[in-house]
Amino acid sequence: MHDPRGFPIHPQPYHLHPTAGGLGEGRMRGGGRRRPGAKLSTDPQSVAARERRHRISDRFRVLRSLVPGGSKMDTVSMLEQAIHYVKFLKAQVTLHQAALVQHEEGCQHADVAAAFSAADADLALELNHRHGGAGDDDAGMTTLEMAPMQEAVGYGDGPAHQMMQQALDPAGQLMMGGAHQLPPLPCCVFVQETDPSCYSVCNVHGEESGAQGSY
């Protein structure tokens, strides 16, 4: 005979005579043997004891139906089997509770890991979007800033355009200026030549001729 966990069950030896044991069990069930002509006592104590024995017998009957193989055992063996069976059920409940708690913790860890992964992905996407937007803004600002400058210096003959070109390429500006435009000469260089008729005609000896004039 084995219990639900596989451990052998050793029935306890009876210390009483079998007849005495059966008599005690019969008393527990129905109050023992009664003579056919005997009348039930109407004493309140006897009635209360009889009802108590009936309730005990009913509880034993229910317990025998719950314990595996209890209907084929005597009262003592059935009680021992009930004790082992209750311990086995308690151990099974403890194991199932531990497994359920472990499963719930694993689900919670998985949910937290998934939430962190989603948050990291969103953060990386936001950073990439910010970097891309900053590059586009810089390019747009450069284009917008260069456009007014080009409009301001777009006049080819204006002073601003010449100053810009001179600042960018002084040597080339000087060469281009020398090739296309020379500075004006001072007015003292140009001497107006006097009409030949105004000069006096002199001979070799320095004498004046009949022509009238002054040098």
Swiss-Prot record:
It comes from the Eukaryota. It holds the Pfam family HLH. Belongs to the bHLH protein family. The keyword Transcription applies. SMART domains: HLH. Expressed in the boundary between the shoot apical meristem (SAM) and the region of new meristem formation. Residues 40-53 are annotated as: Basic motif. The gene is LAX1. This is Transcription factor LAX PANICLE 1. Residues 40-89 form the bHLH domain. One of its GO terms (molecular function) is DNA binding. Transcription factor that seems to regulate organogenesis in postembryonic development. Involved in the regulation of shoot branching by controlling axillary meristem initiation. Functions in association with LAX2 to regulate the process of AM formation. Possesses transactivation activity in yeast.
